[in-house]
Amino acid sequence: MSQQPYYETMYILRPDIPEEEVETHVTKYREMVTEAGAEVLDNQMRGKRRLAYPISNHKEGIYVQLSHNGNGQQVAVLEKAMRLSEDVIRYLTVKQEGPLPAPRIVPGSEPEPVQQQEAAAVEA
């Protein structure tokens, strides 16, 4: 019995679009994957970075990584939407075999047990 593959899609948005529009694109692509019957595992904003070479006269781009699993049909839907978008300057989807990656814990999202103990000691 083989495990269901998961996919990682990295896409680069134009650097000159406003932050609200970036969030709109991220939400749109995440919902597209969900509507296609797949599950979004992780969505990371990598931020604005310098490109290795100019793409469409841009030297920088806003990088976004989307990890998802499903039967593969969501990839065609997602890539078609990205291909037609003028705000996406590059995209790449890679199929990963094997176990799903562990969920990413964002630093600062959960208090450390040591910090809780120190806070209790200060209050006492």
Curated annotation (Swiss-Prot):
GO biological process, one term: translation
Region (Disordered): 99-124
InterPro entries named in the record: Ribosomal_bS6, Ribosomal_bS6_CS, Ribosomal_bS6_sf, Ribosomal_S6_plastid/chlpt, Transl_elong_EF1B/ribsomal_bS6
Keyword Ligase among UniProt keywords: no
GO cellular component terms attached to this protein's record: cytoplasm; ribonucleoprotein complex; ribosome
Keyword annotations of the record: Ribonucleoprotein, Ribosomal protein, RNA-binding, rRNA-binding
GO function terms (MF aspect): small ribosomal subunit rRNA binding; structural constituent of ribosome
PROSITE patterns xref list: RIBOSOMAL_S6 (PS01048)
Biased composition, class Low complexity, residue ranges: 111-124
Function of the protein: Binds together with bS18 to 16S ribosomal RNA.
Family to which this protein belongs: Belongs to the bacterial ribosomal protein bS6 family.
The protein's name: Small ribosomal subunit protein bS6
The encoding gene: rpsF
